[in-house]
Amino acid sequence: MREPRVALESAVLTHGLPYPLNLEVALALEEAVREEGATPKTIALVRGEVRVGLSPEEMEALAAGGAEKASLWNLAALLAQGRSAGT
């Protein structure tokens, strides 16, 4: 049987809260998912690549600032330009 996974948006890291509270909340959300027996998969664009599941270093970089907010209207441009963005 496959392990359950839970998709989490990354906007809390990039636009939802100020640093370092944004990182603390995102890590707490992932831990809450783990406590329920599932694997958290925070979704973001990292340097132009779609990532489903982020490393602690990637979460820190997104939380520190400078990331865009990804949506349908700018997704192609963000990917082509190698940008990082929250979902």
Model regions and ranges:
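Glycine-rich nucleotide/cofactor/substrate-binding loop typically near the N-terminus or early
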Residues: 10, 23-78
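Generic structural signal for well-ordered, non-membrane alpha-helical segments
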Residues: 18-26, 85-87
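N-terminal glycine-rich phosphate/adenylate-binding segment common to multiple enzyme folds
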Residues: 77-87
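Generic N-terminal amphipathic, Lys/Arg-enriched alpha-helix
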Residues: 4-17
